[in-house]
């Protein structure tokens, strides 16, 4: 096999895009911890940290599994429109089939799970955990869209969606501060992620070969069942 500088440059662009998006994501999420730590007692920060940590364990693991599974598969078909569409739609259905019911179950069973693991020590974290799990579902769906974008080598678009996500997160932080509660801050994260998801769907439909109605048809049944 011959060395290809064009392939190397493409790989570097994708890698740099993923790295930049990770930095942006870490910065925006740490902003919430920083602000809560300044404005609220340490006990309140502890409640938020517990809810955030346990919610991340679920959606971060799912996102990683889906990304490592579907990115190589979809990348194989980036030059074959029909096969890419079939593979993308199937990957979207698999993602929704797993992520939607898991998230729904965690939200419904949040109180029993926390009581089983911690007794009543972290009861204040339960409502925050439920909101963050709902947000986590959106993050998984956003990550799946980004996987499809990356599979086509559109690293610039991918970084663009991450910038939009982090700008909305920071904007939601400042918009929810006047409400004076950590729960309001967490709801801000949820609505920022909802807006991000709408934007990412728009970008995904533009850069891939899947139509909006096809995308919605693949996900809606699982969302409604959840």
Map each language-model feature to its residues.
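Short runs within selected transmembrane alpha-helices of multi-pass transporters and secretion channels
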Residues: 1, 21, 25-29, 52, ...
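Interhelical loop/hinge segments that connect adjacent transmembrane helices in multipass membrane
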Residues: 1-30, 69-86, 206-220
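Interfacial/gating helices of multi-pass transporter permease domains
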Residues: 10-14, 18, 34-56, 85-87, ...
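Alpha-helical transmembrane segments of polytopic membrane transporters and translocases
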Residues: 17, 32-34, 46-63, 93-97, ...
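Hydrophobic/aromatic end-of-helix segments at the C-terminal termini of transmembrane alpha-helices
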Residues: 31-36, 40, 50, 66, ...
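Alpha-helical transmembrane segments and their helix-entry boundary regions
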Residues: 34, 45-46, 158-159, 185-186, ...
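Helix-loop junctions and terminal segments of transmembrane helices
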Residues: 51, 55-99, 146-151
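Alpha-helical transmembrane segments of multi-pass membrane transport and lipid-handling proteins
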Residues: 88-140, 170-178, 226
């Amino acid at each position: 096999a011959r060395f290809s500088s064009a392939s190397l440059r493409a790989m570097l662009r994708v890698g740099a895009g993923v790295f930049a998006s990770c930095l942006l994501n870490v910065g925006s999420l740490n902003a919430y911890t920083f602000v809560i730590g300044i404005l609220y007692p340490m006990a309140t920060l502890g409640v938020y940290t517990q809810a955030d940590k346990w919610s991340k364990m679920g959606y971060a693991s799912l996102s990683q599994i889906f990304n490592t599974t579907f990115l190589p598969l979809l990348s194989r078909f980036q030059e074959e429109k029909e096969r890419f569409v079939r593979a993308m739609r199937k990957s979207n259905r698999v993602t929704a089939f797993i992520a939607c019911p898991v998230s729904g179950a965690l939200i419904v069973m949040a109180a029993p799970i926390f009581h089983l693991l911690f007794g009543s020590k972290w009861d204040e974290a339960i409502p925050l955990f439920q909101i963050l799990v709902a947000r986590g579902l959106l993050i998984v769906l956003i990550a799946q869209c980004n996987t499809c974008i990356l599979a086509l080598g559109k690293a610039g678009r991918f970084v663009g969606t991450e910038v939009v996500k982090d700008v909305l997160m920071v904007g939601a932080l400042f918009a929810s501060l006047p409400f004076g509660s950590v729960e309001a801050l967490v709801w801000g994260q949820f609505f920022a992620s909802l807006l991000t998801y709408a934007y990412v769907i728009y970008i995904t439909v533009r850069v891939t070969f899947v139509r909006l109605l096809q995308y919605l048809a693949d996900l809606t049944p699982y969302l409604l069942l959840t």
